[in-house]
């Protein structure tokens, strides 16, 4: 875009051997009536417009900051027409909602405290390269437009996604990776922060291991995202954040409006705080030593009524100030006790975990279920399996068009003993479900290993701290109960942070397994999930302007000890996948030639519908010729497979049949033998001893070689149609031919 009124700045992101990215900030051409507006480009082919506006008057009756962040995904940005019935954009996609949360979390603490004017930030995706991820660009765009708006905002805030990508030269943290690059990444992390002196203070982290991380680590030797590696990633993000902040500050210095004086509504005046502190501090110290949540809440409410009643006459008409001051005094009392005495609300030490319980198979008929409890937090996980055609279809700007694993999180009001609205999920529930999903995706079996769509539902039945991490634990339990062959168990823990002035110095204390009150009165909610070997997901939110990376690194190590303890409890409840439920569909796979797909489907679907009607099985066909057959019982699935093979694979090998095959490939675990064109079987190394006079075989090539003819018998056909073979030796053939005369002789003797 060109024009004399346009002003711009650029941030150059240098990824070394992975190339450079250019983030360009522009203002002055579009959305001129907004308080602040900015166009942000990444490499000139992805463009976002961010506009920030503020209400002219404070919202009456509000005791919080009314900030709204919205993302508008325009399908024309990717050259597409929306797939909805009306062919226009409707409600925001899950990706857009998660992007809104990603922007809101670092921006909200940066506004001046006490602001009550409504502020709205709208980011519109105007053009996008299908290989780009726009969410992190949106963080920078929203910060830029807010910087320009004249609002009391302590920006700029920079956001960057860094991914640990491996190539021939090793692993490197790469900023602003593309979708295609993430296929070779083991971990990707969104980090937002601001410049604090000579350093960068971190304000938000959202991170996860990738879908391919397990294979990259276990099979290709890529670096595992341990706590130390993740800490290195936080440090690697800092120079990029600094470059982004400097580019924003440069443009803001030339184009920002003067900061407007907005009315600021302090929660209370100093005289109110002093009176409440004198009346309540000592009693609050006793109240917040009560371990039980409901008893503690009741005692706190009674004390609050008592204090407010005693001071109402002295501060007539200032009841809201009294209430806010009571909360602030409570916060100070709790924090000082933690920092000075190293003792928490319920009497635990800083690293102690509440009592844990884990139980599986808690519901009848469902495919998998479990309950996980951590103190008063209680989560029920329920797993449902179905055909792959039931996976979620996605119509968004992302190149991902389908999702096999779907994680839904529900947080009913009764989980905290309150009343409230139930129904469609709110942004918080969508965000918590997405976090639990990201924690578990790296350990899921592949589509080929487990050809099922998986829906996982987490029901928060009781809440007192970290229901999202409880959902991760409950989901691990219920999926194992459902028979999902997870590559490893995953557990999660929520860490907290308390900081305050003690003896004139700022002290930090990291808390393991935080309560709801510690979350409310603390400075940080830091959730970490992972296996016993590495981290699979992280989410960090802070109420401060930023947290030193060294403090976060220490909290990560502290979280690992807690995670290992929780994994022991999970493994004690269930350590291997159970058998599939009798109520779950049995899914088997058959491979047919691509040119036979039309014959199996038949004219207008006549043939496939007839097979489904006759057998009661559910059939879906992939473009590559893979046919998935699902049925509630084995005979139905086998009947459908036979019917399909009769059409597409009329000469399908059966168990017990013998072939003179040709060795086509040798591996460390056996040899692959071609039986017929396009049909191979595995002759496992343990079977080769029959060809070596019963001796143990350590090297396959010592017994057979490529091109050698071998007489084999089919011993097994698995659900995916793969054949297991056994060699047929001369003695076996001779014994088979001698059996008949021997039996005849025995009969005549009798």
Curated annotation (Swiss-Prot):
Predominant cellular place of this UniProt entry's protein = cytoplasm
Q: Which Gene Ontology cellular component annotation is one that this UniProt entry carries?
A: cytosol
What GO molecular function annotation could you give as one example from this UniProt entry?
magnesium ion binding
Instruction: Check the record and name the PROSITE patterns matching this protein.
Output: KH_TYPE_1, S1
Q: Where is this region: Disordered?
A: 725-750
Q: Which residues bind Mg(2+)?
A: 519, 525
Per its UniProt record, the required cofactor names are: Mg(2+)
Q: Which domain of life is it from?
A: Bacteria
- Per UniProt, residues of the S1 motif domain are 656-728
Where found in the cell? Cytoplasm
Example GO BP: RNA processing
Positions with biased composition (Acidic residues):
730-750
Top enzyme class, one word, equals transferase
What NCBIfam families has UniProt attached to this entry?
Answer: polynuc_phos (TIGR03591), pppGpp_PNP (TIGR02696), PRK11824.1 (NF008805)
Function, in words: Involved in mRNA degradation. Catalyzes the phosphorolysis of single-stranded polyribonucleotides processively in the 3'- to 5'-direction.
HAMAP family in the record = PNPase
UniProt family annotation: Belongs to the polyribonucleotide nucleotidyltransferase family.
Q: What name is this protein filed under?
A: Polyribonucleotide nucleotidyltransferase
Task: Identify the coding gene.
Answer: pnp
